[in-house]
């Protein structure tokens, strides 16, 4: 593939990742669809998969940048001292650890079958629709009950509930953000607190998993120059776009419902299904 075209495609996918990673519309699902649309392929084994993990790291670094003050405080005050939602840095990260457990277990058990059977544009579109309907139902049933509950503390039970809901994100098209926010609603948290806890939860989950997968695949050293350039470009683009999106998303959540994202999911999914039936995928 021509180097310039390869880099241009990586820019588009970096934008897609940066926009969708923290919105409740499924970044993995969008990447699967756009990779198929653009024919994003490579002669190098596992390159496309590695590219996905690298741009996810770019998106997660946006969280680190935007929440660096809170992260630094929770690390420095690992023992007593009121930080973020918790009264101690230790408790805060312990809640994150608890929330990670269900997802890690499910990932180990179901990663292979999910990758084998659910990584197609049509299956993603179906899940986008089902997830959108679920979001509308969950918001109507749970969100309004928690509008005034701006809790500054996440309990072990709440963390475990959020972690359990995060397990659904293993299904391409479901969305980790949507799953954890709905889990936060069910646990009794406000939308903003649930979303910010979701951002912090993404740091160990996505950062750790992406790094492990990059190492497992074989690292970056054996890739041709064009592919290395595209990785760097995709990482930077995803980082910059995610920084802008996260700030706007939190501001949006304070004023408006998630229903608009649910409607977008369903409209986009219908377009994908029509394209699939017409033979574009």
Curated annotation (Swiss-Prot):
Localization terms from the record: Cell membrane
The alphabetized UniProt keywords are: Antibiotic resistance, Cell membrane, Cell shape, Cell wall biogenesis/degradation, Hydrolase, Membrane, Peptidoglycan synthesis, Transmembrane, Transmembrane helix
Q: Which InterPro entries match?
A: UppP
So where does this one cross the membrane?
5-25, 48-68, 92-112, 118-138, 154-174, 192-212, 226-246, 261-281
- Describe the reaction catalysed, as an equation: di-trans,octa-cis-undecaprenyl diphosphate + H2O = di-trans,octa-cis-undecaprenyl phosphate + phosphate + H(+)
Q: Which GO terms describe its cellular component?
A: plasma membrane
Topology versus the membrane, per the UniProt entry?
Multi-pass membrane protein
Record bears the keyword Cell wall biogenesis/degradation:
yes
- Principal subcellular localisation of the protein: membrane
* Pfam families, A to Z: BacA
Give the EC number(s) under which this enzyme is classified.
Answer: 3.6.1.27
Does the keyword section mention Hydrolase?
yes
GO terms (molecular function) for this protein are: undecaprenyl-diphosphatase activity
What is stated as this protein's family in its record? Belongs to the UppP family.
Q: What else is known?
A: Bacitracin is thought to be involved in the inhibition of peptidoglycan synthesis by sequestering undecaprenyl diphosphate, thereby reducing the pool of lipid carrier available.
Q: What does this protein do?
A: Catalyzes the dephosphorylation of undecaprenyl diphosphate (UPP). Confers resistance to bacitracin.
Q: Which HAMAP family match?
A: Undec_diphosphatase
This protein's name: Undecaprenyl-diphosphatase
Gene that produces this protein:
uppP
């Amino acid at each position: 593939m021509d180097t310039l075209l390869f880099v241009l495609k990586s820019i588009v996918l970096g934008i897609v990742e940066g926009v969708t990673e923290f919105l409740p519309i499924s970044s993995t699902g969008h990447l699967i669809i756009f990779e198929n649309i653009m024919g994003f392929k490579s002669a190098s084994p596992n390159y496309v998969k590695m590219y996905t993990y690298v741009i996810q790291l770019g998106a997660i670094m946006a969280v680190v940048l935007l929440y660096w003050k809170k992260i630094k405080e929770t690390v420095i005050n690992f023992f007593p001292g009121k930080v973020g939602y918790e009264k101690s840095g230790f408790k805060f990260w312990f809640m994150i650890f608890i929330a990670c457990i269900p997802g890690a277990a499910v990932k180990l058990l179901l990663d292979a079958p999910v990758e084998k059977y659910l990584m197609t544009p049509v299956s993603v579109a179906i899940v986008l629709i089902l997830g959108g309907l679920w979001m509308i139902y969950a918001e109507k049933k749970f969100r309004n009950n928690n509008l005034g509950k701006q809790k500054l503390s996440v309990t072990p039970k709440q963390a475990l509930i959020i972690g359990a809901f995060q397990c659904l994100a293993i299904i391409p098209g479901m969305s980790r953000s949507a799953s954890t926010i709905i889990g936060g609603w069910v646990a009794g948290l406000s939308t903003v607190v649930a979303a910010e806890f979701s951002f912090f939860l993404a740091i160990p989950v996505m950062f750790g998993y992406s790094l492990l997968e990059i190492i497992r695949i074989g690292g970056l050293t054996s890739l041709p120059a064009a592919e290395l350039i595209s990785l760097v470009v995709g990482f930077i683009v995803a980082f910059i776009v995610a920084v802008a999106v996260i700030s706007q998303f939190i501001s949006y959540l304070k004023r408006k419902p998630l229903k608009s994202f649910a409607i977008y999911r369903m409209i986009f999914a219908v377009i994908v299904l029509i394209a699939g039936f017409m033979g574009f995928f």
